[in-house]
Curated annotation (Swiss-Prot):
Source species of the chain: Staphylococcus aureus (strain COL)
GO molecular function: structural constituent of ribosome
HAMAP family hit by this protein: Ribosomal_uS2_B
Keyword Ribonucleoprotein: yes
Gene name tied to this protein: rpsB
Protein name per Swiss-Prot or TrEMBL: Small ribosomal subunit protein uS2
InterPro entries for the chain: Ribosomal_uS2, Ribosomal_uS2_bac/mit/plastid, Ribosomal_uS2_CS, Ribosomal_uS2_flav_dom_sf
PROSITE patterns: RIBOSOMAL_S2_1 (PS00962), RIBOSOMAL_S2_2 (PS00963)
Keywords annotated in UniProt: Ribonucleoprotein, Ribosomal protein
Transcription is among the record's keywords: no
Gene Ontology annotations of biological process type: translation
Amino acid sequence: MAVISMKQLLEAGVHFGHQTRRWNPKMKKYIFTERNGIYIIDLQKTVKKVDEAYNFLKQVSEDGGQVLFVGTKKQAQESVKSEAERAGQFYINQRWLGGLLTNYKTISKRIKRISEIEKMEEDGLFEVLPKKEVVELKKEYDRLIKFLGGIRDMKSMPQALFVVDPRKERNAIAEARKLNIPIVGIVDTNCDPDEIDYVIPANDDAIRAVKLLTAKMADAILEGQQGVSNEEVAAEQNIDLDEKEKSEETEATEATEE
């Protein structure tokens, strides 16, 4: 059974592409028809592609991997942040800083600065420093949180990227491709699908469409985590689940005989 229905996609407006004069011919295979100068996306293909992306991210999660959600356009910012947080993943929803992946050593120093400023405040330094200096530190902190808060706990490279609008996030995609990080993307009719490993042909401009698809990808990660957590709990407690079941069956039999 598909993880998303045609009805859900239609209600969210996922089928509306861009104007026919603004399109990428490589998206032709995902287009159903044209109506009033707008391309209509083939939702049967979207359903199939959502399944593929879902299963991929679920597997990444089952293997203990992390996913970086990227969506800096206004229509995507809130969904990317809330859904990444819900799934316990990382996100960038403001500006993509150059070298965020390819020069992570430098970026990680800036992330470390967030904790440094927090510690300064906790230790009471803000109370003894000149007011002007405290104001500057707070400005610096707010700026760092705005751009890097979503990756402050990212200690290593993500195992996958989820991107809303590859045209808008071309820098993120270029860095991920350079590092051979697989990319899942919501790809509208004006984008190049060849840059994306798992294409989800869909409207990337409607908030409801972006929210629906981003939430589905978060669901995939959460489902994968459930598989991991069950196995980890069993391993940590050194419990053979089959043996436990046999033991319970034996106890039940003995109780019946008594």
